[in-house]
C-alpha cells in the first residue's frame, strides 16, 4: 500500500514536472515568437484577421493576442483551466495558454511581422522626410534663400549689465542746449550782421543803414585783427 502511494506520488510529480516544462517552453515561444510558422497557419491568420482585439472571457477586457495571453497567465491562471479559447471558440480542458501557443502559434508570427513592418515603414517614411528636408535646405542655401535659416532666439538680458546701465548718470541735454543758445545770443548781440541790423532798425534811411553796416564791419574787423595779433604775440 505504501509502495503504491509512493509510486503514485512519483508519477504525479513527474507528470507535473513535464507539464511545467511544456508550459515554460510554450511561454518561451510566446515571448520569443515562432520563426518556424508554416504557411497554412499564416493563411489562417490572414483569413481570421490577426490584428483584431480579443475579449477576455473572465473580466471582459480587450487585448491584442500577445497581451491577452500574458493577461490570462498573470491574472486568471486558475480560471484558465476551464476557459474557452477566444480564437477557435472551443472549450479547453487544459491550460488555456498552452492551447493558444500550441494550436494558434501562427498569430505570434503575424503580429511579430506586423510590428517589424510598422517599424520599418515608419523609419522609411521618417528617413524620406529627412532626406527631403535636407535636399530642400541645400537647394535654398545654394540659391541664397533664407527660408530654412531661423533667427536665433533673443538672448535674455544680463541682470548685472541691466543694473549697471541703470546706475550710470544720465546726461542732461537741456543744460547744454541752453548754454549753446546763450553763447549764440551773446555773439549775435555783440557782433550783429547786416541783416540783423536792418531788421532791428527798419525806420532808418537807406544811407544811415549803409553807414551803420560799414561801421559794424569795421568794428568786427578791428576786433578780429586784435584777436589775431594777440595770438601771434
UniProtKB/Swiss-Prot annotation:
Protein name: Protein DEHYDRATION-INDUCED 19 homolog 2
Lineage of origin: Eukaryota, Viridiplantae, Streptophyta, Embryophyta, Tracheophyta
InterPro entries the record matches: DI19 (IPR033347), Di19_C (IPR027935), Di19_Zn-bd (IPR008598)
UniProt family annotation: Belongs to the Di19 family.
Pfam families: Di19_C, zf-Di19
Renumbered residue ranges of the record's region Disordered: 176-215
Biased composition (Basic and acidic residues): 191-214
Amino acid at each position: 500500500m505504501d509502495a503504491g502511494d509512493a509510486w503514485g506520488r512519483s508519477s504525479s510529480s513527474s507528470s507535473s514536472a513535464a507539464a511545467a516544462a511544456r508550459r515554460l517552453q510554450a511561454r518561451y515561444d510566446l515571448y520569443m515568437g515562432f520563426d518556424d510558422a508554416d504557411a497554412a497557419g499564416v493563411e489562417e491568420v490572414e483569413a481570421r484577421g490577426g490584428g483584431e482585439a480579443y475579449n477576455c472571457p473572465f473580466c471582459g477586457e480587450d487585448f491584442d493576442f500577445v497581451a491577452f495571453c500574458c493577461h490570462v497567465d498573470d491574472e486568471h491562471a486558475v480560471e484558465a483551466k476551464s476557459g474557452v479559447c477566444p480564437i477557435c471558440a472551443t472549450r479547453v480542458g487544459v491550460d488555456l495558454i498552452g492551447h493558444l501557443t500550441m494550436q494558434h502559434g501562427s498569430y505570434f508570427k503575424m503580429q511579430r511581422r506586423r510590428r517589424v513592418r510598422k517599424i520599418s515603414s515608419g523609419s522609411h517614411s521618417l528617413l524620406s522626410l529627412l532626406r527631403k528636408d535636407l535636399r530642400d535646405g541645400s537647394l535654398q542655401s545654394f540659391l541664397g534663400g533664407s527660408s530654412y535659416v531661423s533667427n536665433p532666439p533673443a538672448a535674455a538680458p544680463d541682470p548685472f549689465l541691466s543694473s549697471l546701465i541703470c546706475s550710470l548718470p544720465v546726461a542732461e541735454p537741456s543744460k547744454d542746449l541752453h548754454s549753446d543758445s546763450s553763447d549764440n545770443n551773446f555773439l549775435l548781440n555783440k557782433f550783429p550782421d547786416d541783416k540783423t541790423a536792418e531788421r532791428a532798425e527798419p525806420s532808418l534811411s537807406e544811407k544811415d543803414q549803409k553807414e551803420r553796416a560799414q561801421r559794424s564791419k569795421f568794428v568786427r574787423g578791428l576786433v578780429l585783427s586784435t584777436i589775431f595779433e594777440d595770438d601771434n604775440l
